[in-house]
Every structure is written in structure tokens, then in C-alpha cells.
Amino acid sequence: MNKEADLKDQAKNFRLFSETLDIMKKAWSEDFFSHQGEFYTYPSPNFIWQHDMSPPKEKVVDLKTNELKQISVLPKPYQKPFPPISQVVDGERSIQWAAENGLNTIMWIPTVKALKKRFEIYKDAKSKAENRDVPLGEGISLVRDMFVAETMEEAEKMAGEHIVNYMRWVCHWRGLGNHMDPDEKLPETKNKLDLLNYEFLHKRNLLFGTPEFVIEKIKELQQELNLQNLQVWSNFPGIKHEDCMRSIKSVSYTHLTLPTIFAV
């Protein structure tokens, strides 16, 4: 979406992302800042400040030329120097880069087996960068699609078609590779999404079913990955609002769920 980005030049994209992040940190943490990099320059060169109600200050304006030297972004964040920053990651290089640059990470689709390798890559890179033994799971949030109903069949009936349709949209570009276990090979099909159905998704990464089933799947994530942060999404396209809210409440407010999960 950035006009400077180029799908054929990932090295450039990394530099672009890194510079953007540097600018964000400056804007949040410094009263006034300037930046001159490969892609961006702030303030814009030769920007002249002339305003009778806001006379120029030497710190931010060249008093001889009235050219703006620094800018400020308001309001500043409450957390100092700035809030924790999370990067959505998937590939090994992105995971390592995030860990080396002090960023938390967000992961989404992969299976537990595939996530374990990603979690370990982040742990190792973060441990090296911070010169300490970082626990597995620290700094990582996992997103899972969730729909809770009274029975397994009801969950599939109410939400199964919608999650499959959504994943069909997502996988249009990426195929099914991100849903596979390490070293797994799928049978050849005429079209790349022929295997995509509810059963294919459910056993890999869906929290769809009864409260008891969802609890057990979350416990598995905790036990296998030492998962510390879970984000669930229930309002995917096609789901009725009242069904979405009922699903969320059944996990958030029943005696079967949060106390049971956090007792692990």
C-alpha cells in the first residue's frame, strides 16, 4: 500500500519499514524532531513558517529564513517513551528482525507444530539481542478465529461456511501453505484451493465448537507454546452480530472458561 514498496524487492521493503518505525518512535518520544532518511524527510525541505499568531522559535525555525527545522506530533502517548509495538510476522527473517529490534509479534494462521518453530526463532533471537534467557512465548500474541456454540455441530452450522469463505478470500493469493504442518505434503489438486473446507481448517487452527472444546484447544496452545497472549476474532464476514456476541460472551462470562484456562 506504500507507493515506495516493491514486492520484487524485499530488501528495500525492510528498509522502508525500518525507517517508518524510526520516524514513529521519534514522533512519540521527542518533543520536536526532524528526520532525513532514504525515503522520508521531515520537515519537508524549504517549508516556510509564517504565522502572526505563532511567532517562530529558534529551536524549530531558522530565524533568518523562516524555514521549519523541526516538527512535533500531539498528543504524546501516555506510555513512555512510547507504547509497546507489535509487528505482524510470518517468515523467519521478519520474526528475527522483530526480536532484534525490540518489537513484539503477532502471528495468526499456522498450526501448533508450525508455530513452535516460529516461537523458538523469536525466543532465540530475542534472547541474543537482550542478552538474557527469554521464556518461550514472551512477546508473542497469537490470533485465532473463534466461534463458540452449545454443540460442535451448531458451531459448524452457524459459522463454518463463513470462515471457509473468508479463508478462500485470504488464500486466493497465498494458497494453503501457511496452514500446513512442517514437512507436510498435500495431495495434488487441479486448483490450489480444492482442499479448503471446514474439516481442513478445523483440525489445524480453528477454535470452533463447545466451550469445553475451545478450552482444551487453548490449553494445548499454552502447553505446547507457553502462549501468554491470545487474541480471538469472531466477527468475520457473514456472521450475524448477535451470534458473534453470544459466542464471545459464552467464553468470557461462563464458569467453564476463563477460570479454567488461567488455572493451567
What are these regions (language model features)?
Residues 254-260:
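Conserved small/polar residues in nucleotide/adenosyl-binding loops
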Residues 148-153, 240-250:
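Short glycine/threonine-rich loop-to-helix capping motif typified by GTGT followed
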